[in-house]
Amino acid sequence: QLAVEFVKAAEPKCAKLSFEVPANSDFAAIRRELQSHGVSSEEKNDSTPGLSKVLSFVDPKGTVIELFRDWSYVGNGQQVVGVGALKLGHVAFLVPEPKVLAEFYGKVLGFRISDWIADFFVFLRCNADHHTVNFIRGDKVHMHHIAYELRDFAHLQTACDLLGQRKTPIA
């Protein structure tokens, strides 16, 4: 299940990311580990549709991170209307200090570094994909882009047509 909520704002921003952790994960132990890194967290119930319990905290660039162990499908059985992406590929951010974010995502969240380009661009992963997040040096924190996985080129063309019809800016 892929759920993305777009909210019109003055600037592009990714307000929250949610990551699935193994079903047997102990939130109390994760909270202690977060605290050992100076990160405050709290458990929340039903804060996000389909997620009964999450562990919520804020990363160094101000994005809320929610960890969840299990989820339930919240669809109503209707056919997907719109683009219908297969999955979220990755999210990219401009940040003043990519190394700080790479260390946080590595040490605190267990992400692995896939690649560095010099000292200004880092790719990190939490699964078999090359990267799930990347951080590019920039003057201020800013969401750069979101990438979705689509079926094929025809699916991409359909997505672009739909976004164009709705006058949705994609750059």
Predicted segments, located by residue:
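Glycine-rich adenosyl-nucleotide cofactor-binding module
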Residues: 76-94, 101
